[in-house]
Amino acid sequence: MDQAGIIRDLLIWLEGHLDQPLSLDNVAAKAGYSKWHLQRMFKDVTGHAIGAYIRARRLSKSAVALRLTARPILDIALQYRFDSQQTFTRAFKKQFAQTPALYRRSPEWSAFGIRPPLRLGEFTMPEHKFVTLEDTPLIGVTQSYSCSLEQISDFRHEMRYQFWHDFLGNAPTIPPVLYGLNETRPSQDKDDEQEVFYTTALAQDQADGYVLTGHPVMLQGGEYVMFTYEGLGTGVQEFILTVYGTCMPMLNLTRRKGQDIERYYPAEDAKAGDRPINLRCELLIPIRR
C-alpha cells in the first residue's frame, strides 16, 4: 500500500480511538512502523505533526461534549486522555481562546477552534449560501428521544426514518416539500446524554389529507446558512456530520440559538414506503454573522 493509503487508514482508525490511549508507540505499532518513520510519513502526507493533530481532534471532540451534554468537565477531560482538569483547561483555552466552562455556558456556539478530521485528497464543500427566512407557520408532530453522544449519529438516522414513517403512515403520496425541525440539548436526567426533539412538519396549505394529529408549529425566521445535499436519504446523516464537523469550522461560523431546519424535496418518482428514496435536502442552520 502506498504512503497515502497507509495514512488514510490510520486517520480512520485514529478517529475511532480518540478516547483510547494513543501514545506514539501505540500508534506506530498499529501502523507497523517505527515511531520516527511514522511521524515523518504522517508529516509528509498531511503536512501536520501527528501528536498535535491527535490533541487538536481530542479537544474538538471534547468541545462537542461540552455543548451537547452536562457531563462534568473533569469527566470529559479524563475521557479524552488529559491527566487533570487543569491540563485540559490550559490546552482547551489555547485552542478555543476561552475556558471549557465559558465555552459550555455561551448562548451561541462558535466553530472557531474546531479542528476538522483530516481528509486526504480534494474535499468539495457542499453547496451553501446565506439566506434570511420569514416566520413560517407549519403543521407538525414533535417527538423526542435521549441518547449518549456516542450513539447520536446512528440514533438520528434511525429515528428520522421512524418519525417520518409514522408521520406519513396514512399519506396517499409523499408531499413535495417536507420539514424536519431538530433541536438538541443536554438531558436533565442523565449528564452523559442529550435530549433530541424532532418535529416532522408540512406547510399549512399542504397538511390536509396528510397530517391527522398535527399541531401548529412556527418555523422561526432569521439568518441561516443553507447547505444542500442530493442523493439517497441514507446519506443525510453523514452529510449533516460533515457540515458540522468540517464546513462550519472552515467557514468560521457562529451558530445562534434556534432549531436546525431540514427541508426535503423527495424525487418525483418517490413512493410512500420506499426505502431509501432519492431526495434533495436543504439543511438550514441558524447563524449570527
Curated annotation (Swiss-Prot):
Domain HTH araC/xylS-type: 8-106
One GO term (biological process): regulation of DNA-templated transcription
One MF annotation (Gene Ontology) recorded for this entry: DNA-binding transcription factor activity
Record's keyword annotation contains Magnesium: no
Residue ranges of DNA binding: 25-46, 73-96
Task of the protein: Transcriptional regulator. Binds to the right arm of the replication origin oriC of the chromosome. Rob binding may influence the formation of the nucleoprotein structure, required for oriC function in the initiation of replication.
NCBIfam families reported in the protein's UniProt record: PRK15121.1, RobA_TF
Name under which the protein is recorded: Right origin-binding protein
Organism encoding this protein: Escherichia coli (strain K12)
